[in-house]
From Swiss-Prot:
Protein name, per record: Cytosol aminopeptidase
Organism of derivation: Mus musculus (Mouse)
One GO CC term, this protein: mitochondrion
Free-text comment on the cofactor: Binds two metal ions per subunit. Two metal binding sites with different affinities are located in the enzyme active site and can be occupied in vitro by different metals: site 1 is occupied by Zn(2+), Mn(2+), Mg(2+) or Co(2+), while the tight binding site 2 can be occupied by only Zn(2+) or Co(2+). One Zn(2+) ion is tightly bound to site 2 and essential for enzyme activity in vivo, while site 1 can be occupied by different metals to give different enzymatic activities. Mn(2+) is required for Cys-Gly hydrolysis activity.
UniProt superkingdom: Eukaryota
Gene3D superfamilies xref list: Leucine Aminopeptidase, subunit E, domain 1, Zn peptidases
InterPro entries, per the entry: Leucine_aapep/pepB, Macro_dom-like, Peptidase_M17_C, Peptidase_M17_leu_NH2_pept, Peptidase_M17_N
Function: Cytosolic metallopeptidase that catalyzes the removal of unsubstituted N-terminal hydrophobic amino acids from various peptides. The presence of Zn(2+) ions is essential for the peptidase activity, and the association with other cofactors can modulate the substrate spectificity of the enzyme. For instance, in the presence of Mn(2+), it displays a specific Cys-Gly hydrolyzing activity of Cys-Gly-S-conjugates. Involved in the metabolism of glutathione and in the degradation of glutathione S-conjugates, which may play a role in the control of the cell redox status.
The keyword Transcription regulation is assigned to this record: no
Keywords: Acetylation, Aminopeptidase, Cytoplasm, Hydrolase, Magnesium, Manganese, Metal-binding, Phosphoprotein, Protease, Zinc
Residues reported in the UniProt entry to bind substrate: K282, D287, S292, K294, D305, D364
PROSITE patterns: CYTOSOL_AP
Reaction(s) this enzyme catalyzes, per UniProt: Release of an N-terminal amino acid, Xaa-|-Yaa-, in which Xaa is preferably Leu, but may be other amino acids including Pro although not Arg or Lys, and Yaa may be Pro. Amino acid amides and methyl esters are also readily hydrolyzed, but rates on arylamides are exceedingly low; an S-substituted L-cysteinylglycine + H2O = an S-substituted L-cysteine + glycine; L-cysteinylglycine + H2O = L-cysteine + glycine; S-benzyl-L-cysteinylglycine + H2O = S-benzyl-L-cysteine + glycine
Length: 519
């Protein structure tokens, strides 16, 4: 145990407020390693007082109303997502952070397409936990704030930071549920957030560390520790050649790093022969653009061009931990896209697994080339659903930015399921057009059956989706273009700056709901 010195200014403030702190009383037995995050709602009416949550009200009574007294005279009412820290109120919690939750009545917002109350909890709890981390306290108890799952997600997502390769690291903070609330919901939230953090870790890691082989090994380790109902196949280049995945191989051949086709199985259904859901993820572990090389500015971000593979694999790991009663298969073609004497050249023609030929007019449109073969292979499992995720186009970022994942699908039923899941998680999706209008722009090709570029500069995300559709015959397929949500600057308050791991939680929620519908 160590003693955290109370800041001098805070000690003066406490004395002026008439609160004799633990430091004044000399209680050496106090637990100085633990913080507490409590929620308070905004006023519903102008003449109302802001109301504590149940946990907040209980703590206020425990300290004889001092928390309310200090809060009232320390500044204006807390707005949603804002925090205020108090010291020395109780020997078990030397630091108490009160967080603004917004209005208690906040629910699903049909314009924002999310549950505002849940989002407020995630943002507020994340801010409170970071305050505790800044105080270098290794433990924090968190008020469930009326939704223990959302609170857990805010805590675990908000505290995560990739510092694996730094000598100086932030204090690791262990977040626990405060009181005897809904522990099951809290643990579910921890699981959802941990799944997203796994994707963030994979995406943030530098490309010289996170090679195709290393990526596959990490997923294998995580999946096998999640459940015994799993199988992992790390397919080498020779297997890819046997499968005649010429489109995938054409991208991989430019790099000295060997390609890997990762195939993971979670067999949760009591019926071993039940048709699976198949998730497919783009796995470019570094994208230089190839011969059609990218500008050097921000090229380092292309270490996360395997975000599709990271999110779908992390979602399946989470589904295995949840022990969902369904069968799921994950497919991830993994390679680098590099320029060399062996690399694809503009104008080359390659052949996909289904026999279709592809004219490669731009080697930086490589994600669709590797997905084409993976989508063809996905059909061999006779799946119920095929969903692929990919950081596919800069055009998607231009269209939606970081507000939502773009979804292109041939199934309104599948769209509705994904949308409903996203409202729950706050990691939103938005339906994009899959018109024949765009298909004509990719099949009008001089040398081959299909071109990896659209005929015109405009609607790049739509023509990329139309290209993928040429390799899909399944009637329940969705393509998630996650290029716009790949990173977070300051848009999502409960995620730190860096790779976002989105939309992992939405995929987990989709799987959870699908499993309930199936049963």
């Amino acid at each position: 145990m160590y003693l955290l010195p109370l800041p001098a200014a805070a000690r003066v403030a406490l004395r002026r407020l008439g609160v004799r702190g633990l430091w004044d009383r000399g209680l050496s037995t106090a637990d100085m390693t633990k913080g507490l995050v409590l929620g308070i709602y905004a006023k519903d009416k102008d003449d109302d007082l802001p109301q504590f949550t149940s946990a907040g009200e209980s703590f206020n009574k425990l300290v004889s109303g001092k928390l309310r007294e200090m809060l009232n005279i320390s500044g204006p009412p807390l707005k949603a997502g804002k925090t205020r820290t108090f010291y020395g109120l109780h020997q078990d919690f030397p630091s108490v952070v009160v967080v603004g939750l917004g209005k208690r009545s906040a629910g699903v917002d049909d314009q924002e397409n999310w549950h505002e109350g849940k989002e407020n909890i995630r943002a507020a709890v994340a801010a409170g936990c970071r305050q505790v981390q800044d105080l270098e306290l290794p433990s924090v108890e968190v008020d469930p704030c009326g939704d223990a799952q959302a609170a857990a997600e805010g805590a675990v997502l908000g505290l995560y930071e990739y510092d694996d390769l730094k000598q100086k690291k932030k204090v690791a903070v262990s977040a626990k549920l405060h009181g005897s609330g809904d522990l099951e919901a809290w643990e579910k939230g921890v699981l959802f957030a941990s799944g997203q953090n796994l994707a963030r870790h994979l995406m943030e890691s530098p490309a010289n560390e996170m090679t195709p082989t290393r990526f596959a090994e990490i997923i294998e380790k995580n999946l096998k520790s999640a459940s015994s109902k799993t199988k992992v196949h790390i397919r080498p280049k020779s297997w890819i050649e046997e499968q005649e995945m010429g489109s995938f191989l054409s991208v991989a051949k430019g790099s000295e790093e060997p390609p890997v086709f990762l195939e993971i199985h979670y067999m949760g259904s009591p019926n071993a022969t039940e048709a699976p859901l198949v998730f497919v993820g783009k796995g470019i572990t570094f994208d230089s653009g190839g011969i059609s090389i990218k500008a050097s500015a921000n090229m380092d971000l292309m270490r996360a061009d395997m975000g599709g593979a990271a999110t779908i694999c992390s979602a399946i790991v989470s589904a295995a931990k949840l022990n969902l009663p369904i069968n799921i298969i994950g497919l991830a073609p993994l390679c680098e896209n590099m320029p060399s004497g062996k690399a694809n050249k503009p104008g080359d023609v390659v052949r996909a697994r289904n026999g279709k030929t592809i004219q490669v007019d731009n080697t930086d449109a490589e994600g669709r080339l590797i997905l084409a073969d993976a989508l063809c292979y996905a059909h061999t499992f006779n799946p119920k659903v095929i969903i692929n995720a990919a950081t596919l186009t800069g055009a998607m970022d231009v269209a939606l930015g970081s507000g939502a994942t773009g979804v292109f699908t041939n199934s309104s039923w599948l769209w509705n399921k994904l949308f409903e899941a996203s409202v729950e998680t706050g990691d939103r999706v938005w339906r994009m057009p899959l018109f024949e209008h765009y298909t004509r722009q990719v099949i009008d090709c001089q040398l081959a059956d299909v071109n990896n570029l659209g005929k015109y500069r405009s609607a790049g995300a739509c023509t990329a989706a139309a290209f993928l559709r040429e390799f899909v015959t399944h009637t329940k397929w969705a393509h998630l273009d996650i290029a716009g949500v790949m990173t977070n600057k300051d848009e999502i308050p409960y995620l730190r700056k860096g790779m976002s791991g989105r939309p992992t939680r939405t995929l987990i929620e989709f799987l959870l709901r699908f499993s309930k519908d199936s049963s």
